[in-house]
Amino acid sequence: LLGSLGEAGHRVQVHVAMRYGSPALPDVMDELMRQGVQRVLVLPLYPQYSATTTASAFDAVAQWLQRTRRLPELRFVNDYHDDPAYIDALASSVRAHWQREGRGERLVMSFHGIPARCVERGDPYRDQCLRTAGLLANRLGLPQGELVVSLQSRLGRARWLEPYTEPTLRQLAA
């Protein structure tokens, strides 16, 4: 990212900050302020928007803002699920895998799951996942039904978005 921006003539810094790891978001924001950075673009690495993911990163920035005295100009990227560069990157990754391993009968695209109640409350996550999958299938020239969407990483007893990945894989293997 930094290289591409530099080639385009932009003078920027790229920093990684994590919600649940190191370097922690508040520490990175503090360092940016020490360096005199005046504008910050927050780009969560969640292509599809969800209150459970993207918004939690925005919440972390808001918590940091509550304890700072210097307010930088902030911009946020909500999602990039249908950005052509993102779809191209996915397609390139799939094609590279096919070259190394061969092409299977189906391509399974497994997204991280979220509780179904989030979508019922208006979260666009499922629709954006399906849009990403459709654009990828189109970019790869896959016929209808060759790309299968599933969702993984279910926690707890609440109903999560379906279809779940494990049963989907078992069904495809049968």
For each of these PLM feature ranges, what is it?
Residues 1-174:
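Extended amphipathic ligand-handling, pore-lining, and cofactor/metal-binding catalytic surfaces
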